């Protein structure tokens, strides 16, 4: 726009258009749920611009998804988000297979949202068939440390598949393994070292019915004791156009 002194002033902004009033995000404290072991689930309600929804109320349902798509309800909880927009609950699965946490929440304005989060359970005992992907790799943790043993769950829609796995993005003999799935799953263990920091790639492929199926995963291994925290502090909170300013740049280490 142009004001009375013919000076031009311009501005811009952003508008977020969404098809639902808020979103529901569900995460587990592990990459897959070990059968018979307690697992922690975190449920967050937030708008598209990241604002958390406090005091949203509803239910969360644990379901076992059968191979034909049927969902068997195992347990139901009443939940409510706190001031931080988060709710949590603990549960455990009794058998291997595909499961879902289906959450329904309603905010203070009467807006209701439903969301379903699927995950795998793995353990000894009965192996229930499932259908999810031709080939997948599921790390057991979000982050690792040198000396940890990563337990990678390799899964396939094809029973008893034979899968080549490659660790550390290498074709060396010690990195290459041929894994035979027990029905639809196999657990691959890999001990991590300092040389694997800050991340390590894992790749796998299998051939079925003349088609090549590939999967990959990244293991995060933060370099403990080597992280730096940079910060920039301006000399003052506001400056006038053309005014000379100064900033302080600081880097802190773990000590």
Residue positions per predicted region:
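A structural signal for beta-strand and strand-to-loop patches characteristic of beta-rich domains
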Residues: 1-255
């Amino acid at each position: 726009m142009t004001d009375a002194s013919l000076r031009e002033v311009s501005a811009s902004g952003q508008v977020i258009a969404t098809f639902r009033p808020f979103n529901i995000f569900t995460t587990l404290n592990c990459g897959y749920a070990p059968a018979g072991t307690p697992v922690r689930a975190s449920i967050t309600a937030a708008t598209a611009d990241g604002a958390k929804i406090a005091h949203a109320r509803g239910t969360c349902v644990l379901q076992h998804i059968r191979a034909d798509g049927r969902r068997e309800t195992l347990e139901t909880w009443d939940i409510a988000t706190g001031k931080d927009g988060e709710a949590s609950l603990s549960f455990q699965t009794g058998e291997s297979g595909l499961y879902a946490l289906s959450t329904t929440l309603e905010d203070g304005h009467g807006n209701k949202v439903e969301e379903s989060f699927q995950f795998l359970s793995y353990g000894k005992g009965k192996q229930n068939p499932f259908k999810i992907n031709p080939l997948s790799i599921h790390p057991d943790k979000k982050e690792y440390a040198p000396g940890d043993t990563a337990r990678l769950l390799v899964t396939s829609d094809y029973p008893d598949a034979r899968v080549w796995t490659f660790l550390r993005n290498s074709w060396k003999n010690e990195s290459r393994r041929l894994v035979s799935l027990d029905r639809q799953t196999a657990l691959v263990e890999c001990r991590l070292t300092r040389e694997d920091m800050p991340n390590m790639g894992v790749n796998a492929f299998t051939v079925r019915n003349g088609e090549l199926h590939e999967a990959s995963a990244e293991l995060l291994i933060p370099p403990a004791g080597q992280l730096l925290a940079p910060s920039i502090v301006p000399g003052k909170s506001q400056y006038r156009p053309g005014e000379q300013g100064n900033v302080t740049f600081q880097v802190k280490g773990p000590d």
